[in-house]
Curated annotation (Swiss-Prot):
Protein's recorded name: Replication factor C large subunit
Region (Disordered): 419-486
Disulfide links within the chain: none
Function: Part of the RFC clamp loader complex which loads the PCNA sliding clamp onto DNA.
InterPro entries in alphabetical order: AAA+_ATPase, ATPase_AAA_core, P-loop_NTPase, Rep_factor-C_lsu, RFC_lid
Quaternary structure (record): Heteromultimer composed of small subunits (RfcS) and large subunits (RfcL).
Keywords noted in UniProt: ATP-binding, DNA replication, Nucleotide-binding
Gene Ontology biological process: DNA replication
Presence of keyword Nucleotide-binding: yes
UniProt family annotation: Belongs to the activator 1 small subunits family. RfcL subfamily.
Residues annotated as binding ATP: 46-53
Length: 486
């Protein structure tokens, strides 16, 4: 199947979405060269999918130039550049037309296969008679420092998100299928300004049959994942060792995730059984080294795992596969995200069982299998186990089904004694009781004696006292006895 990116690549600058200032600068540059003026080559710098290569081909088509291109999947060392680019830079094509040389992704020149490539490019640019356009994602790499002095730099920004939907609508119309406007906007928003990625996503959805909103929601966010997609494209398409190993250099994903991506997309790209078998053989060897890294904690083996999974799988094919390939994230990641809720519920059940049985959650998993069988066969025993492990209704349903859950819960409900609710008696409002103040007891008065008797008794006592005093005066030497006191 032909790639829609190539099939619907704009043939003219008028068809290129956005980049008005860049298009005007290219027109002035090419017209001055046609007019006989000497101009430095152009270096278009910008993020992947911004339209750098498309602009180069569009300007060539508008002014009837043939194109010779070298890109990241080609070997670009000193000899190749000298033979291909050097010759084309100073000669006309077989049709008699002038030639535009396009050196794509020059910031990807690295390793032994591209040794001396940058230096040879600078040498060719100095003597080139035909126009040269170079493209780069990261123009500020140290290796391109000397090259920047030999070119005119034009920065190409990302395509605005609002410019992407019209392009997608036009492609859908030409391909003869209808697509919801919401889906088009979702594709555009997920692209992160990468028009090429948006077109690839549209083709991926279209090849899957009917395009649904749910499918569009699963599209990757290109702002964070575009590096891994670029890496997949390079690894699957190239047949050069250094190009393949450098493909994952700037990828933000860890090595284990990259391995999963390669494993998922290998059968999509390698259609020959021999190539596929060779590719998986190298991938399995890479997995062996990764296992040794994790077990021994010796990260020096990491480079062997990386080389086997990238260069090994890239060199496993006999030749490059042409055409469009629908790359996608590993299915295991999608499955894990969908089963996150059920896996969490199982963890909660295992924790409860492990707590009651004094074992680990790993050993508790064996108990779950027995519980499922018991739940389906004996409701009474199941009820006791549910109470013992303190399982909730949702957890029982997770292990069995709703019908069995109802039976177990009904048994539990029947075991519990029904407590009659006593209606509280109406209490009458207590009457107000006045406090009783005890009466103070009366002090009884002594009976009153007659006045005459009192006087007589008083006189007798006074006479007796007087007699006693007289007796004491008469006999002072008389010894005092007790009788005298009475």
């Amino acid at each position: 199947m032909e790639e829609w990116v190539e099939k619907y690549r704009p043939k003219s600058l008028n068809d290129v979405a956005g980049h008005n200032k860049t298009k005007q600068a290219l027109i002035e540059w090419i017209e001055s060269i046609i007019g006989g003026q000497n101009q430095k080559p152009i270096l278009l710098a910008g993020p992947p999918g911004s339209g750098k290569t498309t602009l180069a081909y569009a300007i060539a088509n508008d002014y009837a130039f043939d194109v010779i291109e070298l890109n990241a999947s080609d070997k670009r060392n000193k000899d190749v550049i000298s033979q291909v680019v050097g010759t084309a830079a100073t000669s006309k094509s077989l049709t008699g037309r002038r030639t535009l040389i396009v050196l794509d992704e020059v910031d990807g020149l690295s390793g032994n296969d591209d040794r001396g490539g940058v230096a040879e490019i600078i040498k060719v640019l100095k003597t080139a008679e035909n126009p040269v356009i170079l493209t780069a994602n990261d123009v500020y790499k140290p290796a391109l420092m000397t090259l920047r002095n030999s070119v005119n730099l034009i920065n190409v920004g990302s395509v605005h998100t609002n410019s992407i939907p019209p392009v997608l609508r036009r492609i859908a119309l030409k391909e003869g299928f209808e697509i919801d406007e919401k889906i088009i906007k979702m594709i555009a928003s997920h692209s992160g300004g990468d028009l090429r990625a948006a077109i690839n996503d549209l083709q991926s959805l279209a090849t899957g049959g009917s395009i649904e909103i749910e499918d569009a929601k699963e599209l990757p966010d290109r702002d964070s994942e575009k590096s891994i997609f670029d890496a997949m494209r390079i690894i699957m398409k190239t047949t050069h060792y250094d190009i393949a190993t450098s493909a994952t250099r700037d990828v933000k994903e860890d090595i284990g995730t990259i391995e999963e991506w390669i494993s998922e997309n290998l059968p999509k790209e390698y259609l020959k059984y021999k190539d596929l078998a060779e590719g998986y053989d190298y991938l399995s060897k890479s997995d062996v080294f990764l296992g040794r890294v994790y077990r021994r904690q010796y990260f020096g083996l990491w480079r062997y795992a990386s080389a086997l999974m990238t260069a090994g799988t890239a060199l496993a094919k006999e030749e490059k596969y042409r055409g469009f390939t629908r790359y996608g994230p590993p299915a295991i990641f999608t499955k894990l995200s969908r089963t996150k809720g059920s896996r969490q519920k199982m963890k909660d059940i295992l924790k409860k069982i492990a707590l009651k049985t004094h074992t680990s959650t790993k050993r508790a998993r064996n108990t779950v299998d027995y519980l499922t069988v018991i739940f389906e066969s004996n409701a009474e025993v199941s009820a006791e186990l549910v109470e013992y492990y303190e399982l909730t209704k949702d957890e029982i349903e997770f292990l069995t089904n709703k019908t069995i859950t109802k039976k177990i819960l009904s048994v539990i409900a029947g075991k519990k004694p029904k407590v009659k609710k006593e209606t509280p008696k109406k209490t009458e409002k207590p009457k107000e009781v006045m406090p009783i103040i005890p009466k103070r007891p009366r002090i009884s008065e002594p009976p009153k004696e007659p006045l005459k008797e009192v006087i007589e008794e008083t006189l007798e006592k006074s006479v007796e006292k007087a007699d006693t005093k007289e007796e004491k005066k008469k006999d002072p030497k008389k010894q005092a006895t007790l009788d005298s006191f009475f």
